From Swiss-Prot:
This is NPC intracellular cholesterol transporter 1. The lineage of its organism: Eukaryota, Metazoa, Chordata, Craniata, Vertebrata. Changing Y1088C: In NPC1; juvenile form. One of its GO terms (biological process) is autophagy. It is linked to Niemann-Pick disease C1: A lysosomal storage disorder that affects the viscera and the central nervous system. It is due to defective intracellular processing and transport of low-density lipoprotein derived cholesterol. It causes accumulation of cholesterol in lysosomes, with delayed induction of cholesterol homeostatic reactions. Niemann-Pick disease type C1 has a highly variable clinical phenotype. Clinical features include variable hepatosplenomegaly and severe progressive neurological dysfunction such as ataxia, dystonia and dementia. Changing L1213F: In NPC1; juvenile form. The gene is NPC1. Residues 620-785 form the SSD domain. It comes from Homo sapiens.
Length: 1278
């Protein structure tokens, strides 16, 4: 039974109809010319024919699956050669992923040569053709249907969709699909490759996609390879960069730090609010406890000043002196005697002192003939030894300076958007206003006019052609112009090119534009126009660089055109640089004067910022002059003390005020001159800030000295020189304390590496010290002469004229301001009920300032550095509003890496076989997280493109077999042979000598339709070839772009993240500790590096300044530790409150504001040191009395000297045209004066009345002995 069933089954199988796939062709050989050098294939319906042996190499190279048996195929050798030629472009871009290219070869090999063509190819249109050689009539295949399995098409697309094109920072399919890579899919890619309009296919092939038989046709559905699979035993899978499957999960950025909150509120606010409430509770609790205690045992601690008592020592002061008291008293006495003798000498010998002062001033100021003013922004903002500056120098030396940029951003405000209707069908496409054909023609006219601008330098004519960046020079000398009009080769005729008839426009500039923004490197668009997209300079014009204001990637919605003219920059070649600057000057003048009502233009040139900074300085000179004039006028009038109208011209001190001002200015000139001698250049900050600072210090000292004399009464038998010497002995220690502490603080501030702070600190420290020296020498002598003039009743200024005799002598007198401070202000401020209110208010303000301390913005808005009326302000606004690409960034691998070994190559490259943590791969990974890393695109990789270029399957790398010279792919010469053999070894990457042999050829090869991988345009400057002891690769770079950067925070974060990436690359390459490393470079890094450490720099500079002030104060007060602590604490409060004002007033932290903070530290010394010292040396009985005396005597001089002087000058700065003056000078100067005045004249006296140091016992005893028996009133008691 079993045997019978088996036999029956065999019989049924034999009888069952079977489908037999016979081998049959649809074509064989090539026939007539389709167009250009493209030919039709000849129709042929017979069996496949044996391939001639001279075609064996080709079929092994292209279609090794057919190389078996007698190699019978449906193609001849000529067809195979055509197939190879047509595959050159895909080969260059897709062969970096072997499985992708394997599937593509499968598609074309089956189409061209398969012995079973008739199963999946259907000829749909033919025409007769007469062979001109044999006169035989043949048939051209004009149209064809190709039945392709849908699963095969999808698998091929999936294997290729991630493949990168390193030279264009884009996906390879974006260049091969006729669409943007994101819009490409399996079907439209294959349709595009088979469309004759793509410039490569000789005739139309219509693909039909199906996984099932259709109309008796069996779709070609060969096995495919995934991109994570190897195509053979020796070839690796595709790299992570070209195959996302290999990469594993996409890296995720770390989550942003959660805001620090308490109960949902900002933690700093909550903490400071609780702290302040706790302080108030403790403080007022203690206050009321003490108040109740005092009510029980005492009447009040407060007693008014009795100016008839030289000192007042209560019982508690009769105790023993501490160990430091004698030292302090001795030091105080030494300083008093020294300055007393010196003052007497200066008054007795005015001619000698003034003469030598003038000699000193002349000698120092003469250095100004060597003055150099730094206006280069790089020198202003970046220290020569900073990391960014050193990296810039390295980049400039090895690759040349980053090109100079001339850029226009153009809008069409009067033009509406329009709708384009594609032919024959398709959704309507909106086009933005600047993409109107008439606007484009006008913009092209403007662009051509700019190209024709000429400038004159050294009696020579300079044109754009002389200075522009021409990457293919000398083969192609066209300038690089990044403009949408370069899609039309900067030609009016190409822009007007259209195809159509009387009824329809089939293709015009809209069609070409939509194609070029998807494939900017294309040499032939797929429309009927067949115009190239490649720029005339030989490179692609990426749409995100030339269009602005669009949404997502809808470039057709652009609302702005961006035109960029890169100009060569020069390293240490001043003449060439000045030629470029001369042309830029004419460019700026041209665009400024260009008139076109249809266009609104924002523009910049490389020199624009420097030019506008210089113009800003010139434009604000008038404002600054008025500011100083007001201060000078006030000083001159306020120094005098008029007692009657008759003596107005006698008692005025205009001449003395002018002399004091000239001394201040002379000290500034001396400082500038001394440092000019040693070659230290000036900066704009020094010129603008130091006169203000020195005037503050100098005027304060002048008022203290003059008013101390005015309140003093000459003792019986005392001469003028003795009186002035005694007055100087009383006030000069205070002047010395403030000036010397500021000098030391500023000089220590010069330890900062920030150029602005470093330079300012040096100049300021020396200027303040010289000012003090001139004041205790020259000014004392001048004061003595002025007093003699006054005593002789001679008029001020007109000293030869005598005034009317009134019988009165020059007597001690008190000004109205002094009387106000003495009789009204001081008693009111120091009343028992007022002092706690003052403390509570000031601590409250301090608490608020601490709460917002971490909220002050960091950076400097570029537009703020420009005048209000500058064209650059509009340009900066346009950048943030319209631009879609950030600055280019170069990841530089320093000289020292071995590129010739497989290990060294794998550490760098991003293609097949490269490490998953290679340099290129890590930058590629960073671009996937662009919102976090601020890296916008995959990097262009010269080494990956070189490996694709040198492959033996490619027609790119060929040499003359006789001369061994390089043959470009466009050269047709039988002597040109492939560089490397088509063997398994030849298909591997070149190593050792081969690597270096062919690399120079790659770097000199220009791209062309047969080889788009030539590296001349893209990489000629990216690779240093070192000659000498064997040719080797030196420093190289890998370029990409940052994302759009708009704010200072964006720029700072971009720099920080780029350095983090480079550091990680250096570490994973294992070259930490080597002589070379990877670092990022972009043109803006030198300007924003300071902000990476600005907080640390601020803490360091202000901390050093406070430390210096503390030490100097403690020493000069005779080891009065507690006085120094109180004074420095008050100055620290001023600084913290400055940050509060900065937050409230929108002032960011940067080098300019840091200089002002350092200066505010110095000015605060002026407000605080005199009060503190007056309190310390006062002999009154209680702290309240001593605080009142100090405030009465010194407060009025400080208020009239520094506060009123500066306030008048500052108000004028509010009217400056410069935004930087308005924000960083007017606002900060006003804040530092108001905060300094309120803390020095309100808070500090109150604080001293609570916790000030006790009376120096040794000094008290000495004072009592010194004035025992005298009846003279002492208004100032030191």
């Amino acid at each position: 039974m079993t045997a019978r069933g088996l036999a029956l089954g065999l019989l049924l199988l034999l009888l069952c109809p079977a489908q037999v796939f016979s081998q049959s062709c649809v074509w064989y050989g090539e026939c007539g010319i389709a167009y250009g050098d493209k030919r039709y294939n000849c129709e042929y319906s017979g069996p496949p024919k044996p391939l001639p042996k001279d075609g064996y190499d080709l079929v092994q190279e292209l279609c090794p699956g057919f190389f078996f048996g007698n190699v019978s195929l449906c193609c001849d050798v000529r067809q195979l050669q055509t197939l190879k030629d047509n595959l050159q472009l895909p080969l260059q871009f897709l062969s970096r992923c072997p499985s992708c290219f394997y599937n593509l070869l499968n598609l074309f090999c089956e189409l061209t040569c398969s012995p079973r063509q008739s199963q999946f190819l259907n000829v749909t249109a033919t025409e007769d053709y007469v062979d001109p050689v044999t006169n035989q009539t043949k048939t051209n295949v004009k149209e064809l249907q190709y039945y392709v399995g849908q699963s095969f098409a999808n698998a091929m697309y999936n294997a290729c969709r991630d493949v990168e094109a390193p030279s264009s920072n884009d996906k390879a399919l974006g260049l091969l699909c006729g669409k943007d890579a994101d819009a490409c899919n399996a079907t439209n890619w294959i349709e595009y490759m088979f469309n004759k309009d793509n410039g490569q296919a000789p005739f139309t092939i219509t693909p039909v996609f199906s996984d099932f038989p259709v109309h008796g046709m069996e779709p070609m559905n060969n096995a495919t390879k995934g991109c994570d699979e190897s195509v053979d035993e020796v070839t690796a899978p595709c790299s992570c960069q070209d195959c996302s499957i290999v990469c594993g999960p996409k890296p995720q950025p770390p989550p942003p730090p959660a805001p620090w909150t308490i109960l949902g509120l900002d933690a700093m606010y909550v903490i400071m609010w609780i702290t302040y409430m706790a302080f108030l509770l403790v403080f007022f609790g203690a206050f009321f406890a003490v108040w109740c205690y005092r009510k029980r045992y005492f009447v009040s601690e407060y007693t008014p000043i009795d100016s008839n008592i030289a000192f007042s020592v209560n019982a508690s002061d009769k105790g023993e002196a501490s160990c430091c008291d004698p030292v302090s008293a001795a030091f105080e006495g030494c300083l008093r005697r020294l300055f007393t003798r010196w003052g007497s000498f200066c008054v007795r010998n005015p001619g000698c002192v003034i003469f030598f002062s003038l000699v000193f001033i002349t000698a120092c100021s003469s250095g100004l003939v060597f003055v150099r003013v730094t206006t280069n922004p790089v020198d202003l903002w970046s220290a020569p030894s900073s990391q960014a500056r050193l990296e810039k120098e390295y980049f400039d030396q090895h690759f040349g300076p980053f090109f100079r940029t001339e850029q226009l951003i153009i809008r069409a405000p009067l033009t509406d958007k329009h709708i384009y209707q594609p032919y024959p069908s398709g959704a309507d496409v909106p086009f933005g206003p600047p993409l109107d054909i008439q606007i484009l023609h006008q913009v092209l006219d403007l662009q051509i006019a700019i190209e024709n601008i000429t400038a004159s330098y050294d009696n020579e004519t300079v044109t754009l052609q002389d200075i522009c960046l021409a990457p293919l020079s000398p083969y192609n000398t066209n300038c690089t112009i990044l403009s949408v009009l370069n899609y039309f080769q900067n030609s009016h005729s190409v822009l007007d090119h259209k195809k159509g008839d009387d009824f329809f426009v089939y293709a015009d500039y809209h069609t070409h534009f939509l194609y070029c923004v998807r494939a900017p490197a294309s040499l032939n668009d797929t429309s009927l126009l067949h115009d190239p997209c490649l720029g005339t300079f030989g490179g692609p014009v990426f749409p995100w660089l030339v269009l602005g204001g669009y949404d997502d990637q809808n470039y057709n919605n652009a609302t702005a055109l961006v035109i960029t003219f890169p100009v060569n920059n020069y390293y240490n070649d001043t003449e060439k640089l000045q030629r470029a600057q001369a042309w830029e000057k004419e460019f700026i003048n041209f665009v400024k004067n260009y008139k076109n009502p249809n266009l609104t233009i924002s523009f910049t040139a490389e020199r624009s910022i420097e030019d506008e900074l210089n113009r800003e300085s010139d434009s604000d000179v008038f404002t600054v002059v008025i500011s100083y004039a007001i201060m000078f006028l006030y000083i001159s009038l306020a120094l005098g003390h008029m007692k009657s109208c008759r003596r107005l011209l006698v008692d005025s001190k205009v001449s003395l005020g002018i002399a004091g001002i000239l001394i201040v200015l002379s000290s500034v000139a001396c400082s500038l001159g001394v440092f000019s001698y040693i070659g230290l250049p000036l900066t704009l900050i020094v010129i603008e800030v130091i006169p203000f600072l020195v005037l503050a210090v100098g005027v304060d000292n002048i008022f203290i000295l003059v008013q101390a004399y005015q309140r003093d009464e000459r003792l019986q038998g005392e001469t003028l020189d003795q009186q002035l010497g005694r007055v100087l002995g009383e006030v000069a220690p205070s002047m010395f304390l403030s000036s010397f502490s500021e000098t030391v603080a500023f000089f220590l501030g010069a330890l900062s590496v920030m150029p602005a702070v470093h330079t300012f600190s040096l100049f300021a420290g020396l200027a303040v010290f010289i000012d003090f020296l001139l004041q205790i020498t020259c000014f004392v002598s001048l004061l003595g002469l002025d007093i003699k003039r006054q005593e002789k009743n001679r008029l001020d200024i007109f000293c030869c004229v005598r005034g009317a005799e009134d019988g009165t002598s020059v007597q001690a007198s008190e000004s109205c301001l002094f009387r106000f401070f003495k009789n009204s202000y001081s008693p009111l401020l120091l009343k028992d009920w007022m002092r706690p209110i003052v403390i509570a208010i000031f601590v409250g303000v301090l608490s608020f300032s601490i709460a917002v301390l971490n909220k002050v913005d960091i950076g400097l808005d570029q537009s703020l550095s420009m005048p209000d009326d500058s064209y650059m302000v509009d340009y900066f606004k346009s950048i943030s509003q319209y631009l879609h690409a950030g600055p280019p960034v170069y990841f530089v691998l320093e000289e020292g890496h071995d590129y010739t070994s497989s290990k060294g190559q794998n550490m760098v490259c991003g293609g097949m076989g490269c490490n998953n943590d290679s340099l290129v791969q890590q930058i590629f990974n960073a671009a996937q997280l662009d919102n976090y890393t601020r890296i916008g695109f995959a990097p262009s990789s010269w080494i990956d493109d070189y490996f694709d270029w040198v492959k033996p399957q490619s027609s790119c790398c060929r040499v003359d077999n006789i001369t061994d010279q390089f043959c470009n792919a466009s050269v047709v010469d039988p002597a040109c042979v492939r560089c490397r053999p088509l063997t398994p070894e030849g298909k591997q990457r070149p190593q050792g000598g081969d690597f270096m042999r062919f690399l120079p050829m790659f770097l000199s090869d220009n791209p062309n339709p047969k080889c788009g991988k030539g590296g001349h345009a893209a990489y000629s400057s990216a690779v240093n070839i070192l000659l000498g002891h064997g040719t080797r690769v030196g420093a190289t770079y890998f370029m990409t772009y940052h994302t759009v950067l708009q704010t200072s925070a964006d720029f700072i974060d971009a720099l920080k993240k780029a350095r983090l990436i480079a550091s990680n690359v250096t570490e994973t390459m294992g070259i930490n500790g080597s002589a070379y490393r990877v670092f990022p470079y972009s043109v803006f890094y030198v300007f924003y590096e300071q902000y990476l450490t600005i907080i640390d720099d601020t803490i360091f500079n202000l901390g050093v300044s406070l430390g210096a002030i503390f030490l100097v104060t403690m020493v000069l007060l005779g080891c009065e530790l507690w006085s120094a602590v109180i004074m420095c604490a008050t100055i620290a409060m001023v600084l913290v409150n400055m940050f509060g004002v900065m937050w409230l007033w929108g002032i960011s932290l940067n080098a300019v504001s840091l200089v002002n903070l350092v200066m505010s530290c110095g000015i605060s010394v002026e407000f605080c040191s005199h009060i503190t010292r007056a309190f310390t040396v006062s002999m009154k009985g209680s702290r309240v009395e001593r605080a009142e005396e100090a405030l009465a005597h010194m407060g009025s001089s400080v208020f009239s000297g520094i506060t009123l002087t500066k306030f008048g000058g500052i108000v004028v700065l509010a009217f400056a045209k410069s935004q930087i003056f308005q924000i960083f000078y007017f606002r900060m100067y006003l804040a530092m004066v108001l905060l300094g005045a309120t803390h020095g004249l309100i808070f500090l006296p109150v604080l001293l009345s609570y916790i000030g140091p006790s009376v120096n016992k040794a000094k008290s005893c000495a004072t009592e002995e010194r004035y025992k028996g005298t009846e003279r009133e002492r208004l100032l008691n030191f």
